[in-house]
């Protein structure tokens, strides 16, 4: 590999793998590069640049296919070597709708292979395993046939071979906050093996991908990432790995996990998958609480995430805050996704605080912020829309409808808690998302909130928040139970 800290090797039990050539500290950027090829989901094509993935208010579309969009002429020119064949296929398939992202990525992989046929050889393909599973092989034949037909490159077997490698080695293309953008493939990162307790994580910064260490890694230690959601129970993880990647995981976490389907939470999977409405998800949460289901076990994290989204759809920031606080408090995996949750929790916490402030002081100017301090005279500090989202704050009918007012939670104590969370988030984001736009945005928001709340900064250092967090946790739970 073209990186000084790692090397590709052949390992017993693993075959191909990647090891550290030196000691690597936590939060170290091991690899930073542009992904080799990417393809946006159809829903993102018109609002996202297909080269750099930047979202612009106005994008420029390709004049020929009128489907792929770019943020600038420079990005369009840079993408042309990969778009030229895709463009032809998109025009040919227009009557049948937009080609799916996996088919468009396959066409781009063909061009990558055409430039350097040896580049795909290190990739696992598992073509024999694909052919043994009728449904998987049907997908391979269908996508390969479409790519071959619309590009008029009649090499079906080659496209099938490339599809198998794509299916096993492609990654989800996401934003730094894990919002889905599409699919991508990188010929260096695909050499990393899987673990359900990985020591590295992949972070995207637009079309740039980073491999970042999650903990200290010793020289000659193998580097691992996770191919799947590590918050899922063991039985579901093993099924997903076997179905998509054709292997079973024997990492230490899996080997030491002796839970059964009755105790690992997988029995809730069907109900979670079918619970689309907020009220059904809240009913499921009440059932989990009533049977004493462990807060750190599946499906709590996934369920509370769905509840948060449902509350946001109703513009209920108190409910969204309650769900996310319970989710974040019980999260055993302090990874990049947890950091994103903490950032969203901070933003929702500011929204909740501003709602209380709006009800207590309804005549304040819309772009001013007051936090009454017990030790300092009240001050009015101007802020901006992006920090506290002061416009159109719903009151929900009165202070007793806010989570702080309903449970008599002091606004002063809540602000101190927010400052403590912000300080910890500032340290965590530098480790999880180093040198990314996301990290800069988080740090800027934290800097602004500390400036706005500067009268509290000396107080929060010595404040014991354990009792407060217990009260807040109970309030959040009751808020959802009685919703």
UniProtKB/Swiss-Prot annotation:
Residues reported to bind Zn(2+) 1: 49, 52, 71, 75
Enzyme class per UniProt: transferase
Keywords: Cytoplasm, Metal-binding, Methyltransferase, Nucleus, S-adenosyl-L-methionine, Transferase, Zinc, Zinc-finger
Domain SET: 4-228
GO MF annotations, alphabetized: histone methyltransferase activity; zinc ion binding
Protein EC: 2.1.1.-
Localization of this protein: Cytoplasm; Nucleus
Gene3D superfamilies: 1.10.220.160, 6.10.140.2220, SET domain
ZnF locations on chain (MYND-type): 49-87
Annotated Zn(2+) 2 binding sites: 62, 65, 83, 87
GO cellular component terms listed in the entry, alphabetical order: chromatin; cytosol; nucleus
Classification via CDD domains: SET_SMYD (cd20071)
PROSITE patterns, per database record: SET, ZF_MYND_1, ZF_MYND_2
GO-annotated biological processes: chromatin remodeling; methylation
Family, similarity comment: Belongs to the class V-like SAM-binding methyltransferase superfamily.
Protein name: SET domain and MYND-type zinc finger protein 6
Native organism: Schizosaccharomyces pombe (strain 972 / ATCC 24843)
């Amino acid at each position: 590999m073209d990186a000084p800290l790692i090397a590709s090797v052949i390992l017993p039990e693993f075959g191909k793998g990647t090891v550290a050539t030196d000691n690597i500290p936590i939060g170290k950027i091991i690899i930073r590069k542009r992904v080799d090829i990417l393809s946006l989901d159809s829903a993102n094509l018109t609002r996202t640049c297909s080269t750099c993935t930047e979202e612009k208010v106005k994008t420029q579309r390709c004049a020929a296919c009128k489907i792929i969009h770019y943020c600038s002429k420079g990005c369009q020119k840079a993408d042309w070597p990969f778009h030229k064949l895709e463009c032809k296929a998109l025009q040919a398939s227009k009557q049948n709708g937009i080609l799916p992202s996996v088919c468009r990525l396959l066409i781009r992989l063909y061009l990558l292979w055409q430039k350097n046929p040896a580049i795909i050889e290190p990739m696992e393909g598992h073509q024999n395993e694909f052919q043994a599973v009728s449904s998987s092989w049907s997908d391979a034949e269908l996508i390969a046939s479409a790519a071959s037909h619309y590009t008029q490159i009649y090499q079906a077997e080659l496209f099938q071979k490339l599809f198998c490698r794509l299916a096993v080695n492609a990654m989800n293309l996401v934003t730094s906050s894990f919002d889905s953008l599409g699919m991508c493939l990188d010929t260096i990162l695909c050499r990393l093996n899987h673990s359900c307790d990985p020591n590295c994580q992949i972070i995207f910064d637009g079309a740039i991908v980073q491999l970042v260490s999650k903990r200290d890694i010793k020289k000659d230690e193998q580097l691992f990432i996770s191919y799947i959601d590590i918050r899922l129970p063991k039985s579901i993880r093993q099924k997903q790995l076997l179905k998509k990647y054709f292997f079973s995981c024997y990492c230490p976490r899996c080997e030491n996990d002796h839970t059964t389907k009755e105790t690992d939470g997988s029995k809730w999977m069907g109900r979670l998958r079918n619970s689309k409405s907020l009220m059904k998800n809240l009913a499921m949460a009440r059932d989990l609480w009533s049977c004493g289901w462990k807060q750190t076990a599946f499906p709590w994290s996934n369920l509370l995430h769905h509840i948060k989204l449902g509350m946001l759809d109703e513009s209920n920031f108190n409910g969204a805050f309650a769900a996310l606080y319970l989710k974040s408090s019980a999260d055993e995996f302090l990874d990049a996704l947890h950091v994103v949750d903490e950032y969203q929790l901070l933003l929702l916490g500011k929204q909740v605080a501003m709602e209380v402030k709006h009800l207590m002081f309804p005549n304040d100017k819309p772009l001013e912020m007051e936090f009454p301090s017990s030790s300092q005279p009240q001050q009015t500090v101007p802020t901006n829309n992006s920090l506290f989202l002061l416009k159109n704050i719903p009151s929900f009918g009165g202070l007793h409808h806010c989570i702080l007012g309903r449970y008599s939670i002091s606004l002063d104590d809540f602000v101190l808690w927010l400052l403590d969370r912000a300080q910890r988030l500032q340290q965590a984001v530098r480790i999880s998302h180093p040198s990314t736009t996301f990290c800069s945005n988080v740090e800027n928001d934290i800097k602004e909130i500390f400036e706005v709340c500067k009268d509290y900064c000396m107080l929060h250092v010595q404040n014991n928040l354990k009792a407060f967090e217990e009260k807040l946790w109970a309030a959040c739970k009751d808020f959802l139970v009685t919703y």
